[in-house]
């Protein structure tokens, strides 16, 4: 499946979708440091094929990708749904931009992530109005045996006629069973990004904001494995 990765960060979510067999064909990421990491990872051969990286989702046109992209993924920012924002939309609310891209691309499925239940509920409501069925799950890194929490809500959306496609995924994700026993062999707090740049603050910010690949892949697998899909 061809993936359009929104809010791609430094590539944690993209590594998860690589585990699931996706092929990233385009990414969107505003942070310059994360874009540098994504470019370096492509040069390192971490991804199946090279892909373009757009900077600002607010200027990204998804229409040329209709018919090419099968799945849109993204951990959209949660600032607009924080307690400080009192759940009100602000200039930081970028879910409407992700929703716009989904409408333009019309993907076969959508996989989204957020730390806020309110944000995920809003996304689910909007996607259901667009004709998708949705499933959500709460899963943290600690649930897979890590010594840090990183609690996240994960949302999978798909049209009724794609149920067969998702069942096929179920047969491909058995390798994720037992992943928690092997993925935490090193302390994530000591992670290093070997990209030749010494931007420690930016590196830690990217790690802190990013998705844990094993958690993202497992969340997708669990959502697909639900009996009513």
Regions found by a protein language model. Give the residues of each.
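Conserved active-site and SAM-binding loop architecture
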Residues: 1-229
């Amino acid at each position: 499946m061809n993936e359009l990765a929104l809010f791609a960060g430094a590539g944690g979510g993209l590594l998860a979708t690589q585990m699931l067999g996706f092929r990233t064909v385009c990414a969107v990421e505003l942070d310059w440091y994360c874009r540098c990491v994504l470019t370096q990872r492509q040069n390192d051969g971490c991804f199946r094929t090279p892909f373009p990286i757009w900077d600002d989702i607010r200027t990204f046109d998804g229409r040329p990708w209709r018919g090419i992209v099968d799945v849109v993924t993204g951990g959209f920012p949660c600032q607009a749904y924080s307690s400080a924002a009192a759940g009100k939309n602000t200039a930081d609310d970028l879910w409407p931009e992700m929703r716009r891209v989904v409408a333009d691309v019309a993907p076969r499925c959508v996989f989204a992530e957020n730390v806020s239940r309110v944000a995920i509920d809003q996304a689910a409501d909007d996607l259901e109005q667009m004709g998708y069925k949705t499933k959500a799950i709460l899963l943290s890194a600690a649930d897979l045996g890590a010594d840090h929490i990183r609690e996240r809500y994960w949302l999978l959306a798909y049209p009724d006629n794609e149920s067969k496609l998702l069942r096929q995924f179920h047969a491909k994700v058995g390798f994720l069973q037992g992943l928690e026993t092997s993925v935490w062999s090193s302390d994530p707090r000591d992670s290093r990004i070997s990209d030749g740049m010494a931007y420690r603050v930016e590196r830690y910010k990217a790690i802190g904001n990013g998705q844990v690949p094993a958690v993202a892949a497992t969340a997708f697998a669990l959502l697909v494995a639900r009996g009513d899909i």
